Amino acid sequence: MKNTIMRNWIVAIVVIAVVAALVVLSGLFRASSVAPQAQQTLSPERMQALIPRGRELALAGDCFGCHSMPQGPMGAGGLAIATPFGTLYSTNITPDKQYGIGNYTRADFHRVMRDGIAPGERNLYPAMPFVFSHITTPDDIDALYAYNMSIPAMPIANKSNTGVFVLPVRPFMDFWTLLNFPDRKVLRNDQRSAEWNRGAYLVEGLAHCGSCHSPRNFMMGVEFSRSLQGGEVDGVVVPDITAAALAKRGFDVPTLSTYLATGMAPQGTSFDSMYTVTHFSTSAMEPEDVKAVAIYLLTGKDGKLALPAASPVPLPQAAVPKNGTPMAAGRLAYMASCAGCHGMEGEGIPNVSPAMKGNAALAMDNPQTIINVVLNGTPTQVFKNGERMYAMPPFAHRLNAPEVADLVTWIRAEWGGQTVPVTVEQVSAQETAVK
């Protein structure tokens, strides 16, 4: 009798588990958040009127920074996005009917932006930041739709993904969304300024700052409980951009606005993936939107703007290093390999190389960013204010790991106020991570 009861319980549990799995895989639990009016077609006149607004929103969302190859046709896709599970390639989002989104209806586009589901019930991978665009208002999604449908159609085929993404894993994204796609709402605080609320809408939505600047879990889901506290992309650390962290690196609303609008500020210049953001997105945004983003990011939980910290004071052991110490070796390496461009006093050279003095990257607790720059260099960069920075050569084959560790330790102590020395193991790990 007991065995029969136990067997019945086991069968019941198995049946429930199978049914639950089928429900998840079929997406039955996922109620669409698309507004009912999206089922109606927009008139040609309305579409035309929405295009300018849509362009502004597309710039804020940096849509074409991901959906375009460098020097390639706008929106034609093909940009590689590395993940621990394989490489994804951004897709063609031009109105081409064969390879792009030319056959998307208004409702189709809304569902992509709000639910992360493409026509044919095709689950999108989270490289498409639908967990952020989910909060975008229906009117703004309409404007984006109108603009995307107005750009030149590019008959360019989409590239095939690699790794696990070649397998039929899209249905399993329903499991992913169950755990990693919270029903987020537009942040609205009537006790805060209109600028703060506008900045919150952009940062937490279309601009998807937290997509890179927040930690991710083992499933690559954004950890919203640690939003904007820093992340990692392609083995390179992405800095914490909470109010306290930005203020510690010397930013205030004017300097952060300048950085976003030009890619340059007293705290340094944008580079790597952030250069793409400032060059193609934030530098083209309306100035009032840029300021709103800066105000939101620099406002603490108490509702007050964080005050910028004073410039770091050089550590005594860096200013006057003792002979034979790693600090002395680091200073010597800087003078031999870096001072010619960055200056004996770290002052930099306008239109050639950024200053080390006051550089926010040196004030970061994690040295990965500077290690990566020393090892791999940076390309020539042209900024929207007309200035440029010339290419920095890689030093991976000129300096060994101990020399890089000493160099980075010294510049962080001299201009970043950092007391913790960089280890050979940290350099070696970064050499491996970026290969």
Where do the PLM segments sit?
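Glycine-rich, acidic and aromatic/proline-enriched surface loops and short helix-turn segments
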Residues: D115-A118, T262-P266, N376
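Aromatic- and charge-enriched surface segment that lines or borders ligand/interaction sites
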Residues: Y99-I117, A143, R249-V253
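Flexible coil segments in periplasmic/lumen-exposed cytochrome c-class electron-transfer proteins
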Residues: F29-T41, M69-T87, P119-G205, S214-P239, ...
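Short extracytoplasmic
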Residues: L42-G72, A80
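N-terminal Sec-pathway targeting helices
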Residues: K2-V18
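C-terminal structural cap/anchor segments
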Residues: A329-N372
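Short cysteine clusters
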Residues: C63-C66, C209-C212, C338-C341
